Amino acid sequence: MKQTDFREPIFLLLFATLITTLFSTCSFLYPLNPWDDANVYMTIGNAMLSGKDLYVDIFDHKGPVLYLMHEMAAMLSRNSFVGIYLIEILCSFCFMWYSLQTMRLFSSSKITLPLTCLLGWLTLSSDLFYYGDSVEEFSLPILAHCLYFMLRFAKNRQTPVWWQSLFMGIGLGLILWTKFNILFFYIGGILTLAFIAWRHQQMKELGHIVMWVTAGVVLATIPILAYFVAHGTVEALIDAYFMVNIFQYHGTATNGEPDFWWFPLMKLAIWAVLTLPIFFVRARWEVKLLILGTYGVLLLSFATMTVQFYYFLLMYAFSPLVIYFFRNHIPTFRTYVAIALIGILSAATNWNLVTLLNGTFPKSVLEMAEIINANKSDDSEVLTFSSYDTGIYQHTRHLPPNKNFFISSILDPEIKKEQAEWVTSGKVKYLVREIGAIVTCHEYYDAPIPENYHCIYDKEELFRYRLITTPHKFLWNLTYPRVLLQYIMDPVTVNQRMLVYEREP
């Protein structure tokens, strides 16, 4: 029995390696990660490794845990995402492991393991996973871990031992210092568990859980604060992470439409099927109440902000509840065939894998880097302006010369002024610009290019497919004489234009 239990996590670890390799652009299969957010994180990690102070010398508004993680990844490789790739494998494994444990709370069927693999496959191949290296991806195993112990308490009145509660607190602390909006999940869970404990006269047990969870949060917080105290940048941390996110960041919508409508409609339907049935099957009222509390409050939190579609990746934490459909199912050959077909269909509609195989994966950043690297000199500094981080800093092995090295959804006149001064000063040899069709804040941060710069690279390429943009556009596309599968494989396209300007001698 012990041997079987040992082989199971090894199998899940190998499967996590497989799906991460196939679907994350951080893996060695892909030449680069084209996502601007991921490149921002890695650029900041490189800058911190080179001695720059976070939020003071280089700026973004996410939490410090994210950048410290990328600093550690940069220790392994400064111009690739191999360090993040290894972290992603661990996260995928932990997510599937605790999803499996959650399923086994409600079923002893042998279907739980293959179903767990299917959920892991669907999660990483979904549009919500995007390119990989998102805050939501790294938070998903933490939510799955916490949800398992909360469901176990709600279903069986079984309280976690002290070290399990401590680890839940450490996970909560990591989320606190990565993206505090996700704490809505915990708020809903804690309030629901408090009510359940009160009804069953288990307030003492709940008190012990809260005590050790709090200790875990403190344990995760101490090294974070110690880092900023040592660097004398606590005030910058508070201002950049809390004040900016609460009062300034609103997530600029694209093309004048709410970002929610980017959410792929088909995957939304699949996600609903996987999670919502809990409310329509026979289960203890405590379990339903807990799911409603965590699920509902987290979903409600999205209504308070401009939502990027990949935020909804967090909802896959609830996907193990699909076991309610199969809790008495005995898997047969047809079961495995069905699972395989679903996996193949999901992979066949995965943008990352499809474009890698058909040769249309965006590679213009590598071409730009090759041009810049071929003409390197002592003053060949690189500056991106009026655009996101394209990854040019990693591939040219440069660091940004300025603090605000990319445009963000914060329309800040000080950031605009700093970027404009750097562009017009003529201090850098190369100016790199990305003009994206999906971003509306380019014009705000635009700056005139000095006359002594000339364009040496100009290329437009496919950046991303969008299954839908707005409801009326989605319905309009369906009126065309094409079958649904053709629509899936030939959706709305988004192009980006990449330019490099070189200063004349």
Regions found by a protein language model. Give the residues of each.
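Transmembrane-helix motifs of polytopic, lipid-linked glycan transferases
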Residues: 86-107, 145, 149
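Transmembrane-helix signature of polytopic, membrane-embedded enzymes
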Residues: 99-123, 140-141, 157-159, 163
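Short periplasmic/luminal acceptor-recognition loop of GT-C membrane glycosyltransferases, typified by
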Residues: 357-442
